[in-house]
């Protein structure tokens, strides 16, 4: 029998869901309430069952919006440890949520479209506009002063329309909470652009111009993950349509494009990126606050790489973050890729759905600015989650410093929407080119993985001083041993040798009796002995194979394939080379000491 429709009012929106329900009490107890916060801060609530999968909830939200280009979006939730997660479509919602119902989730943009011009429907562009608006307010979208003023003017034009002196007082911009920190200078510039440059633009046009400007910025689409690098410096990792990016302060210090990313993996709290730089393989390591944060970072990287890199979803394979001898986590992105989404959008032939815009004017007192970025990690100015995001996703804590006004630099390009459209029609060939402003310039630096790992250089003379040969008393004393002493030592040596031979015969006889069954042994000891023998045999086989792979110059195809795997390179650089240098140093020291003697 069918259950009645559940329609729960929340905010300004409601949502209807129909599901099967039996008349048993057990079935009724399996119903769970779920609240989803939308991009305009309204909420919808529904009831789900224990077996309901994540895709069911995503589809119902998209049906509520009448959204067809839904592959850009996802649902995010937070576990009791304040760790964020993306709801997986193919898994049960109940099994993914580690809290008791009712559940609270957020509907957000998961994959940012690389080319806003290829978005077919106005509804999709409006939802992306709301996400960009949130990113601007939360401090995730860094930009110059002129770009910030233009983005703010687009938001004002989209929500208020043309400037009207009768309706808009002198300080009308101060009623809008657009940026984490708005100066009067920035507000005056927004008013100037709103009055003179955007007049006559409808809300869809103003929103589209904002997307054209935002997608040219370096931090467009970056969801920052706070980490520590090998030197202990706080960095923010992100994934964009171009590739894997690393930020320190207000600058992008590293970019590896998706075709050059060989593998993403994690072990405990350490996240590894193995990629190609100038035809040479390099491995970057970053440390997160918890293993759960590291796994979330890895899964986000795997999904973004699959979405932006591949031409077809059939090319996506299951990825394993495995160690050399142990099985690790396995994960596979199950959605469409960017090219498939664009192709599907081009085939949409329906009448565009009506877009219900919410005219939201946020007051400055509606948000608290006293939340901390992440537990046990020092916050930085760039890419900080917003106060409202922290209320949804992160624990309470101390205040977060906000970007200062003097950190906003001179304009980079004109704020004219016509010029912005022209810039999009002729985009730069490389994302890291044509960046010329300070101090918010995001500059591409040459990455040297050994620069921060090697100790201070030491001269050869100083190294030799570390291995000074000590004086030996044997060289200074005379040979005073007599013939009688030497003969006595020889007799003692013969006696000791005979005793050792007797012990060896007894050990061999005992081993033979055990093998033939004349002596009964504990089965546990016998199993352990067999395991020890097998382990020694494998060691005798694996050790020569490793030497063959590491030291020989044999150019066989299967040996080359093994040498080129990221796991083997990690073992070679992190374990084998240090061990080899240590052994070589000890041998060099012994030979040097023997040479001195």
From Swiss-Prot:
UniProt keyword annotation of Membrane present: yes
Membrane-topology annotation of the record: Single-pass membrane protein
Molecular-function GO terms, alphabetical: cytoskeletal protein binding
Paired cysteines (S-S): none
Example GO BP: actomyosin structure organization
Pfam families: FA, FERM_C, FERM_M, FERM_N
SMART domains: B41, FA, FERM_C
Domain named FERM: residues: 32-312
Expression by tissue: Ovary-specific.
Entry's localization field: Membrane
Matching SUPFAM superfamilies: PH domain-like (SSF50729), Second domain of FERM (SSF47031), Ubiquitin-like (SSF54236)
GO CC, any one term: membrane
Transmembrane segments: 531-551
Keyword DNA-binding among record annotations: no
Region (Disordered): 383-403
Keyword vocabulary terms for this entry: Membrane, Transmembrane, Transmembrane helix
Biological function: Putative tumor suppressor gene that may be implicated in the origin and progression of lung cancer.
Protein name, UniProt field: FERM domain-containing protein 3
């Amino acid at each position: 029998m069918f259950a009645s429709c559940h329609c729960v009012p929340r905010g300004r929106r409601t949502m209807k869901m129909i599901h099967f329900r039996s008349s048993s009490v057990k079935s009724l107890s399996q119903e769970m309430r779920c609240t989803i916060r939308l991009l305009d801060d309204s909420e919808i609530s529904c009831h789900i069952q224990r077996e309901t999968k994540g895709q069911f909830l995503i589809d119902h939200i998209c049906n509520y919006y009448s959204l067809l280009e839904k592959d850009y979006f996802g649902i995010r939730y937070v576990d009791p440890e304040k760790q964020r997660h993306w709801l997986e479509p193919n898994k049960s919602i109940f099994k993914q949520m580690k809290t008791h119902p009712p559940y609270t989730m957020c509907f957000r943009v998961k994959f940012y479209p690389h080319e806003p011009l290829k978005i077919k429907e106005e509804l999709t562009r409006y939802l992306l506009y709301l996400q960009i608006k949130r990113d601007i307010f939360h401090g995730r979208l860094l930009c110059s002063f002129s770009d910030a003023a233009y983005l703010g003017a687009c938001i004002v034009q989209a929500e208020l329309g043309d400037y009207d002196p009768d309706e808009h007082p002198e300080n009308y911009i101060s009623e809008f909470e657009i940026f984490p920190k708005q100066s009067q200078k920035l507000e005056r510039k927004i008013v100037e652009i709103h009055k003179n440059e955007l007049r006559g633009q409808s809300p869809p046009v103003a929103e589209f111009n904002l997307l054209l400007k935002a997608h040219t910025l370096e931090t467009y689409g970056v969801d920052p993950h706070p980490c520590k690098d090998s030197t202990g410096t706080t960095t923010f990792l992100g994934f964009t349509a171009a590739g894997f990016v690393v930020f320190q302060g207000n600058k992008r210090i590293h970019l590896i494009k998706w075709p050059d990313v060989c593998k993403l993996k994690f072990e405990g709290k350490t996240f590894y990126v193995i990629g190609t730089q100038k035809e040479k393989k390099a491995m970057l390591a970053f440390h997160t606050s918890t293993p759960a944060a590291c796994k979330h970072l890895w899964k986000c990287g795997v999904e973004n790489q699959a979405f932006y890199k591949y031409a077809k979803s059939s090319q996506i394979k299951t990825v394993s973050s495995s160690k050399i001898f142990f099985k690790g986590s396995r994960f596979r992105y199950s959605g469409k890729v960017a090219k498939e989404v664009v192709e599907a959008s081009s085939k949409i032939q329906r009448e565009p759905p009506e877009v219900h815009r919410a005219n939201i004017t946020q007051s400055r007192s509606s948000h608290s600015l006293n939340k901390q970025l992440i537990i046990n990690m020092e916050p930085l100015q760039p890419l900080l989650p917003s106060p409202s995001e922290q209320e949804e996703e992160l624990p309470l804590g101390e205040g977060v410093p906000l970007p200062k006004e003097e950190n906003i630099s001179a304009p980079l390009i004109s704020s004219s929407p016509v010029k912005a459209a022209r810039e999009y029609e002729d985009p730069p060939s490389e994302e890291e080119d044509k960046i010329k402003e300070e101090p918010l310039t995001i500059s591409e630096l040459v990455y040297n993985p050994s620069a921060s790992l090697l100790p201070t250089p030491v001269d050869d003379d100083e190294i030799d001083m570390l291995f000074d040969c000590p004086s030996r008393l044997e060289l200074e004393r005379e040979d005073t041993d007599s013939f009688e002493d030497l003969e006595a030592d020889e007799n003692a040596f013969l006696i000791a040798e005979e005793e050792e031979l007797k012990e060896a015969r007894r050990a061999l006889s005992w081993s033979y009796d055990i093998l033939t069954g004349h002596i009964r042994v504990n089965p546990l000891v016998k199993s352990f002995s067999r395991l020890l023998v097998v382990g020694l045999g494998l060691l005798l086989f694996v050790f020569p194979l490793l030497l063959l792979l590491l030291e020989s110059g044999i150019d066989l195809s299967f040996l080359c394939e093994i040498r080129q795997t990221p796991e083997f390179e990690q073992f070679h650089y992190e374990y084998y080379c240090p061990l080899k240098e240590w052994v070589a140093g000890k041998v060099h020291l012994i030979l040097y000491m023997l040479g001195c003697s």
